[in-house]
């Protein structure tokens, strides 16, 4: 499996680095984050959009490799969606956990049905090339891939089941708050049966190529750039999803704004906000798994970053980032679905596999970057304070280097 991963990465790198020589980065181009997208078990199959908080295109072509690890855990849960409008109306008047619907058969009690269970540590590998077309246009090309694991030491120190449950037991949450110990630690149980009768199943050490993404950014020249130190950019996005479960094309648009403040003692403050809109599955090449019946994914992101420059001209930057994404499924269905799970055996979150598909997903990210003219090294952690556990906790590291034209 490791050989497959290395072969994929080396093939992409060889295509991008051929005839290239090391060069220098133009140091500190806005907030230059790596991909901080979550390892959500639906999201990994689509070409979700990262936010771009740079001031301008890079002066040189850059290559970045990004690795992230996220612990996803949602116990087995079943969902029924009655087709009878009168039954829907009755259920909508009852809180979701008190609803009663006894399915007999499709003729007597017609209803859609699905079930899902997610228990895995998902590893994401991204290789990205950013090419400056000119001083106002940039093209980014990304290859993303995934590895499904049990999350054992030493490869998942912070995102393993043991690490998370130790934190719950000794710091916050209490003993086994979501049922990880009840179901068993360090295992993979990744299965989704959709309402169309299709099954998505992944096993330990399964590796797949998620897709290829093309991102174009336009950086307009405005008087605000010099008078107010405010920078804007606009993106258009095309994603080719290549997994067997979602062979499709996504398209999207984005808009971002960054404010730069120069402070005393070699400090700099950047404030940024961005918005993205993705149209999933605008083209399907074959029948795909139902990864949410909401065709659009919208996201908002904001960040505050403080930078300290060293005497040698390098820098240390700390950022706090908030990200929120729209729900995967249409909100109206959440008014009448019937959920079935082990609510008596599990302390909390037994419903999350379906319930959270009807809720916006948010996360806080803490990002540290060390920048030099030769490379950018970034570390980040992602925490889901809403405890949707998709993922519960995520860590990542990225290395970016310049390559000449």
Write out the residue ranges for each language-model feature.
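Outer membrane beta-barrel transmembrane domains
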Residues: 170-194, 284-405
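Residues that define the transmembrane beta-barrel architecture of outer-membrane proteins
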Residues: 45, 59-61, 119-125, 147, ...
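Residues on the lipid-exposed face of transmembrane beta-strands in outer-membrane beta-barrel proteins
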Residues: 49-51, 125-131, 212-220, 238, ...
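A subset of solvent-exposed loop/turn segments in beta-rich extracellular surface proteins, enriched
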Residues: 21-198, 326-350
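Outer-membrane pore/translocation modules
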Residues: 139-295, 302, 333-353
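Short loop/turn motifs that connect adjacent beta-strands in outer-membrane beta-barrel proteins
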Residues: 21-25, 47-61, 130-138, 221-230, ...
């Amino acid at each position: 499996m490791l050989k497959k991963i290395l072969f994929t990465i080396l093939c992409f790198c060889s295509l991008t680095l051929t005839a290239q020589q090391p060069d220098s980065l133009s140091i500190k181009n806005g907030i230059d984050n790596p991909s901080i997208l979550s390892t959500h078990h639906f999201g990994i199959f689509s070409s979700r959009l990262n936010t771009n908080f740079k001031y301008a295109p890079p002066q040189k072509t850059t290559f970045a490799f990004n690795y992230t690890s996220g612990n996803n855990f949602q116990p087995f849960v079943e969902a029924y969606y009655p087709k009878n409008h009168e039954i829907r109306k009755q259920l909508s008047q009852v809180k979701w956990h008190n609803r009663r619907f006894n399915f007999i058969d499709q003729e007597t009690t017609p209803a859609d049905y699905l079930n899902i269970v997610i228990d895995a540590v998902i590893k994401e590998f991204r290789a990205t090339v950013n090419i400056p077309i000119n001083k106002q246009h940039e093209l980014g090309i990304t290859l993303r891939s995934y590895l499904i694991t049990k999350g054992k030491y030493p490869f998942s120190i912070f995102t393993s089941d043991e690490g998370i449950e130790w934190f719950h037991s000794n710091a916050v949450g209490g003993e086994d708050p979501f049922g990880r110990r009840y179901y068993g630690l360090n295992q993979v149980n990744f299965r989704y049966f959709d309402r169309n009768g299709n099954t998505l199943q992944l096993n330990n050490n399964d590796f797949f190529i998620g897709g290829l993404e093309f991102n174009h950014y336009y950086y307009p020249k405005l008087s605000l750039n010099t008078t107010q130190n405010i920078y804007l950019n606009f993106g258009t996005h095309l994603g080719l999803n290549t997994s067997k479960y979602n062979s499709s094309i996504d398209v999207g648009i984005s808009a971002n704004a960054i404010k730069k403040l120069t402070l005393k003692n070699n400090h700099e403050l950047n404030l940024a906000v961005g918005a993205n809109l993705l149209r999933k599955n605008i083209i399907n090449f074959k029948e795909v798994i139902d990864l949410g019946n909401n065709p659009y994914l919208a996201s908002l992101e904001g960040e505050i970053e403080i930078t300290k420059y060293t005497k040698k001209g390098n820098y240390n930057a700390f950022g706090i980032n908030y990200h929120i994404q729209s729900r995967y499924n249409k909100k109206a269905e959440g008014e009448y679905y019937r959920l079935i799970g082990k609510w008596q055996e599990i302390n909390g979150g037994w419903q999350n596999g379906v319930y959270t598909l009807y809720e916006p997903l948010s996360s806080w990210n803490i990002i540290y970057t060390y920048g030099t003219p030769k490379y950018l090294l970034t570390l980040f952690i992602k925490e889901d304070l809403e405890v949707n556990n998709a993922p519960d906790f995520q860590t990542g590291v990225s290395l970016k280097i310049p390559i000449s034209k």
